[in-house]
Curated annotation (Swiss-Prot):
Catalyzes amidations at positions B, D, E, and G on adenosylcobyrinic A,C-diamide. NH(2) groups are provided by glutamine, and one molecule of ATP is hydrogenolyzed for each amidation. PROSITE patterns: GATASE_COBBQ (PS51274). This is Cobyric acid synthase. Keywords: Cobalamin biosynthesis, Glutamine amidotransferase. The active site is at C343 (nucleophile), H434. NCBIfam families: cobQ, PRK00784.1. Belongs to the CobB/CobQ family. CobQ subfamily. GO terms for molecular function: ABC-type vitamin B12 transporter activity; catalytic activity. Gene3D superfamilies: 3.40.50.880, P-loop containing nucleotide triphosphate hydrolases. The lineage of its organism: Bacteria, Bacillati, Actinomycetota, Actinomycetes, Mycobacteriales. GO terms for biological process: cobalamin biosynthetic process. Residues 262-442 form the GATase cobBQ-type domain. Pathway: Cofactor biosynthesis; adenosylcobalamin biosynthesis.
């Protein structure tokens, strides 16, 4: 197959959120990049509190940063021009081209629709001019027809840019054939004309047993299934949003310990959790068992408690108090148990949070485990950062409104230039820096300190855990799955020629 003939763009839509859109796009990106194709990802609009900072100080969804890495590219606001960061069930922070613009509700958002359509169209056109292939990812599901009028990322994008659409469904959840059929059936005829085929995700067992169902799906829709991606036990990439972070569930696939002891980590699954991927670096370590928890009883046998980031720090702090987790953290810390807070979690560990920006609650007492006072400012800090933690070079990124007004504890590290960052008091650690735990040497030092405080004398950190290499291996595994299980000639034809003409329309009462 001639690699130079890979040209064009398509949209990967899903029957539901978390159906496999992000991982399929990442796998396709990696597969094409390995073949020397100039490829870029694009998600017109993302709704997620898992984000990263670009080189120019913008903010995009974590999934698009991962897809960019799969392409061999640095993250850019071009890949995710519109980001919605939920702060409550009814409002989200609107980020356009990497910058926070305002807070919107569902009805307010309509006022921005015209401008956002222009932004999305400009960025996609620019990417298509600069790259051989642009792989677009939808948002949620195109079957949410109540949102069709304001849609920027699904059929609204496909219609505007004349993109062929692949619909992916997760068979592990059951009902995938109905989901695929129904997704097409509820669409308007003009939208149906762009649905060119299907992909089944997370299939377990003998694929030949699925063949009769796929044959019937083709007969009913006139569209082929371009591939069946098998369930991969070893695949656990960065969660795109909170749907991928399940409470009271393990993180990753823990490898056996190097020494005699395990370290047990309880990571608090906050309602408005952000950048949950910080915790995944801990789960990469052999002998470290990490669980997301929502029940205070889960903290009783934890060696380390982690408070991750939050898009609604004060609201999530109140949730901790209501359900008893705040008291459980206090008991854990009182007996010398290690606690780590990252960004919003760090702010919660302090003595007071003054928030007239996100919650409007004013001064709110923190958990009091650090001598720290934080005040929220309207402008968000967005930066890639580097520094030094006790002789170890470290790096990360900052995304927060909170400013430290007073810190009575020693710093956890120093930023480049010498500014103090973070806090440490006994076995309580805190930092505003996301991504810090991805620095391998720092993570090992921290875990050694945690093990000492927790009395896990038999725990030994592995000397060679490389989080960046693990992520790269995950992307290569995804690319292998795509390469081995998708109809690549059909995919190449779709990219080059678009959706075939004359695809049948599935009539339904909803369309009459």
């Amino acid at each position: 197959m001639s690699e130079s003939r890979w040209r064009g763009a398509l949209l990967v839509a899903g029957t539901t959120s978390d159906a496999g859109k992000s991982v399929l796009v990442a796998g396709l990106c990696r597969m094409l990049a390995r073949r020397g194709v100039r490829v870029a990802p694009f998600k017109a609009q993302n709704m997620s509190n898992n984000s990263v900072v670009t080189l120019d100080g913008g903010e995009i969804g974590r999934a698009q940063a991962l897809q960019a890495a799969a392409c061999g590219l640095e993250p850019s606001v071009r890949f995710n021009p519109v980001l919605l960061k939920p702060g409550s069930d009814r409002t989200s922070q609107l980020v356009v081209r990497g910058r926070a613009v305002t807070t919107v509700g569902a009805r307010d958002y309509i006022e921005h629709r015209g401008h956002l359509r222009t932004v999305v169209a400009e960025e996609l056109q620019s990417l298509r001019a600069d790259y051989d292939v642009v792989l677009c990812e939808g948002a949620g599901s195109p079957a949410e027809i109540n949102l069709r009028a304001t849609d920027l990322a699904n059929m609204g994008l496909a219609r505007a840019a004349d993109l062929p659409v692949l619909v992916v469904g997760d068979i592990d959840r059951g009902g995938v054939l109905a989901h695929l059929f129904g997704t097409v059936a509820v669409l308007a005829p003009e939208d149906q004309a762009l649905i060119a085929g299907f992909v089944i995700n997370k299939f377990r067992g003998d694929v030949s047993l699925l063949a009769p169902g796929l044959g019937q799906l083709t007969a009913m829709t006139g569209r082929p299934t371009l591939g069946v991606i098998p369930f991969a036990e070893d695949l656990w990439l960065d969660a795109e949003d909170s749907l991928g972070v399940v409470g009271d569930a393990p993180v990753g696939r823990p490898a056996p310990p190097v020494g005699d002891d395990w370290l047990r980590v309880a990571a608090i699954r906050l309602p408005r959790i952000s950048n949950s991927t910080d915790v995944e670096a801990l789960a990469c370590e052999p002998g470290v068992s990490v669980r997301w928890v929502t029940d205070p009883s889960r903290l009783e046998d934890a060696d380390l408690v982690v408070l991750p980031g939050s898009k609604s720090t004060v609201s999530d702090l109140e949730w901790l108090r209501r359900n008893g987790i705040a008291d459980a953290i206090a008991v854990h810390a009182k007996r010398g148990g290690p606690v780590l807070g990252v960004c919003g979690g760090y702010q919660m560990l302090g003595s007071v949070i003054v928030d007239d920006v996100e919650s409007g609650r004013g001064a709110v007492p923190g958990l009091g485990l650090l001598d720290l006072e934080v005040e929220f400012a309207p402008d968000k800090v967005l930066a890639q950062v580097r520094g030094d933690a006790h002789g170890v070079p470290v790096s990360g990124y900052e995304i927060h409104h909170g400013r430290v007004r007073r810190n009575g504890d020693p710093p956890l590290l120093h930023a480049r230039g010498g500014a103090a960052e973070g806090s440490i008091r006994g076995a309580v650690y805190g930092t505003h820096w996301h991504g810090l735990l991805e620095t391998d040497r720092f993570r090992r030092i921290l875990l050694d300190d945690v093990a000492e405080h927790a009395g896990r004398t038999g725990f030994v950190t592995a000397p060679d855990t490389d989080v960046a290499a693990i992520r790269t291996a995950q992307l290569d595994l995804l690319a292998d799955l795509v390469e081995q299980n998708l109809d690549l000639p059909a995919l190449q034809a779709l990219l080059g020629a678009g959706a075939p003409a004359g695809l049948p329309v599935i009539a339904s009462d909803l369309l009459r």
